[in-house]
């Protein structure tokens, strides 16, 4: 069984994933890192040179390679029905959430997020992305955790309690 960490960029999926693997006998997989390694270029370069559709194809392929892993998924992975179905059939999906203003503060200096690159009003853009993805996140998630005012340890422990 896999544990899929889903949610918007900046919710802490990679950080929480690494903490979870210290508590569980699972490997940790950051899908974005695996995609970059496979493609030989950054996510931003993939978006710029090959387009979002090609990135989403790589993402869907990488999702299927792992078992008994904690997988930090890219924020948009839930936009494809095939990915939502695969996660439901092969593990538990944990949705990490935070308000657009909290995410904007966390991501203010980030240049590695192609959907935010060069954008002025990141908070408004994040809110629009959330509204577009919200139902897919909620329908995919087996459990949801609001991360805005919790420590990494509190979030990790809440997930572990839910998995027991």
Feature annotation, model-predicted:
Residues 5:
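Hydrophobic anchor at the beta1->P-loop junction of P-loop NTPases
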Residues 8:
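P-loop (Walker A) phosphate-binding loop of NTP-binding proteins
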Residues 14:
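Walker A/P-loop
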Residues 19, 23, 134-164:
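NTP-dependent small-molecule kinase module
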Residues 31-77, 81-88, 112-113, 127:
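ATP-dependent small-molecule kinase phosphotransfer cores
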Residues 69, 93-94, 143-145:
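Short, well-ordered beta-strand core segments
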Residues 75-77, 99-101, 150:
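Short glycine-rich anion-binding loops that position phosphate/pyrophosphate groups of nucleotides
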Residues 90-134:
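A glycine- and Lys/Arg-enriched "phosphate-lid" helix/loop adjacent to the NTP-binding pocket
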């Amino acid at each position: 069984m896999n544990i899929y960490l889903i949610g918007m960029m900046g919710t802490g999926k990679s950080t929480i994933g690494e903490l979870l693997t210290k508590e569980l006998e699972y490997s940790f997989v950051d899908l974005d890192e695996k995609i970059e390694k496979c493609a030989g270029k950054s996510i931003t370069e993939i978006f710029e040179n090959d387009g979002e559709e090609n990135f989403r194809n790589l993402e869907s392929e990488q999702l299927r390679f792992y078992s008994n892993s904690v997988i930090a998924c890219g924020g948009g992975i839930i936009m494809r029905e095939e990915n939502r179905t695969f996660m439901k059939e092969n593990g538990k999906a944990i949705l990490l959430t935070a308000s657009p203003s909290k995410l904007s503060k966390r991501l203010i200096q980030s240049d590695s997020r192609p959907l935010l690159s060069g954008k002025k009003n990141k908070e408004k853009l994040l809110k629009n992305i959330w509204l577009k993805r919200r139902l897919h996140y909620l329908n995919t998630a087996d459990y949801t955790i609001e991360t805005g005012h919790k420590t990494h340890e509190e979030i990790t422990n809440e997930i572990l309690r839910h998995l027991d």
